[in-house]
């Protein structure tokens, strides 16, 4: 079982993805750079966690869209 992310990571990731949906992909490295540009996060660790959460959300949405189109 995986680790639980803190609420502030989730809320920041969801907010950034909602505001800039075209800036994020399913590539962690690209998302890391985009988060650094868009949000003022002083900590590298927090930036990486937010980028990882956004990557996971994007992958989940793509899989969901693919499943809906196949059904």
From Swiss-Prot:
It comes from the Archaea. PROSITE patterns: RIBOSOMAL_S17E. InterPro entries: Ribosomal_eS17, Ribosomal_eS17_CS, Ribosomal_eS17_sf. Keywords: Ribonucleoprotein, Ribosomal protein. GO terms for cellular component: cytosol; ribonucleoprotein complex; ribosome. One of its GO terms (molecular function) is structural constituent of ribosome. The keyword Iron-sulfur does not apply. GO terms for biological process: translation. Pfam families: Ribosomal_S17e (PF00833). Belongs to the eukaryotic ribosomal protein eS17 family. This is Small ribosomal subunit protein eS17. The gene is rps17e.
